[in-house]
From Swiss-Prot:
GO MF terms, alphabetically ordered: rRNA binding; structural constituent of ribosome
GO BP annotation list: translation
Name of this chain's protein: Large ribosomal subunit protein uL24
CDD domains (alphabetical): KOW_RPL26
Keyword terms, alphabetized: Ribonucleoprotein, Ribosomal protein, RNA-binding, rRNA-binding
Function: One of two assembly initiator proteins, it binds directly to the 5'-end of the 23S rRNA, where it nucleates assembly of the 50S subunit.
Quaternary data: Part of the 50S ribosomal subunit.
UniProt GO cellular component terms: ribonucleoprotein complex; ribosome
Record-stated family: Belongs to the universal ribosomal protein uL24 family.
Keyword Ribosomal protein attached: yes
Pfam families, per the entry: KOW (PF00467), ribosomal_L24 (PF17136)
Cross-referenced HAMAP family: Ribosomal_uL24_B (MF_01326_B)
Gene behind the chain: rplX
Length: 104
């Protein structure tokens, strides 16, 4: 099955501590998890690695979020939207369900 949320899509968080925030999808881990830029930040206690000249400390990084907790952001309407699929010129493309506009 084709993915409704892909890398570099702008998404909006629907639930959780970051509800309402928008960000760009950095990575799709599996069919059910994505990493979004600036969303779901966690603190990681990092040990120093002298061989790589990396200092230790507490580092903030993005953690994975369930794909069901995000929705694609439609810039034309300024709201979260749903994704549909259709065939155009023999290719399967994604489109916004609210205004039938093709997603890049």
């Amino acid at each position: 099955m084709a993915a409704k949320i892909r890398r570099d899509d702008e998404v909006i968080v629907l639930t959780g501590k970051d509800k309402g925030k928008r960000g760009k999808v950095k990575n799709v881990l599996s069919a059910s998890k994505v990493i979004v830029e600036g969303i779901n930040l966690v603190k990681k206690h990092q040990k120093p690695v002298p061989a790589l000249n990396q200092p230790g400390g507490i580092v903030e990084k993005e953690a994975a979020i369930q794909v069901s907790n995000v929705a694609i952001f439609n810039a034309a309407t300024g709201k979260a939207d749903r994704v549909g699929f259709r065939f155009e010129d023999g290719k399967k493309v994604r489109f916004f369900k609210s205004n039938s506009e093709t997603i890049k």
